[in-house]
Amino acid sequence: MEAVMECEPDIIFIGGRLSASYDALNEIAPVVYLATDTQKGLVESVNDNARTIASIFGLEKEVDGKTADFAARIETLQKKAEGNTALVGMTTSGSFNLMGNDGRCSIIGNEIGFDNLAADSVTESRGGGSEHSGSEEKPSKETSDDLGKEGNGSGQGSTSTHGNEASFETVVSMDPDYIFVMDRDSAIGTEGAQLAREIMENELIMKTDAYKNGKIVYLEHPAVWYTAEGGITALDVMLSDLEGILQ
């Protein structure tokens, strides 16, 4: 906090990971809280966040052009996703955790339109999405970054933070057209961790149509997907990752 005070900012922008520091930061300068709302959707949250910032700095036209570009790119990806099933998950500590459409990587099922089979199997244990205000309103204590991993090996439970650990037998039984994999250990720089490809390409996963058809997708920039989604630059990178595989 001392370093922030020394900068003497006129305004402070924070995301969900700093929501617990809202009060302390607000004593230094007005705080604008910018996070994502899973009920609204990642893309609309990004657009709203960008418009909030643009309104402060008079950059509305630039943001309008960027959001229009995102819409066109998403429409193209939706055509690729139409009629295809998928599982979306992250590898961490040698296991594979399924993600629903309620948190990280939710753009794949919600906006791009893949039929995320994990979304059908998870139990939404939270009543609503993560908080987003795009204003000086204090965020709720319950954000997507505050919740821990739940699950019993079947991929069931709230998936908003780290997903739910699923056995590889569960993945085989679901047999999706695509499997999207985000490497959490790479995203956070875990030393000595298994790479996502080493975890996923085992004898069981090799039985899936996704493996046989070359449709296991390893998201190229896991650090962005895991820690940075919610901004214009991050969304641009995420769409590029999907475009590189699907087009």
Where are these regions (language model features)?
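Second-shell loop/turn segments in exported
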Residues: P9-I12, A35-K40, R51-K61, G94-S95, ...
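Acidic/His-rich segments in extracytoplasmic proteins that coordinate ligands and/or metal ions
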Residues: M1-I56, I188, G244
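Structured C-terminal subdomain patch of bacterial secreted/periplasmic proteins
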Residues: E44-D48, S55, D64, D177-Q247
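Structural recognition of the beta-strand scaffold that forms the well-ordered cores
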Residues: I11-G15, V32-Y33, A86-G89, Y178-M182, ...
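Extracytoplasmic ligand-binding site segments that recognize negatively charged/polar headgroups
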Residues: A20, L34-T52, T85-I107, G127, ...
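Stable alpha-helical elements in mature extracytoplasmic
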Residues: R17-S21, V46-N49, E62-K66, R73, ...
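Short helices/loops that flank or line small-molecule/ion binding pockets
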Residues: E2-E8, A166-D175
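Basic- and aromatic-lined ligand-binding clefts that recognize polyanionic substrates
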Residues: E62-T143, L147-Q156
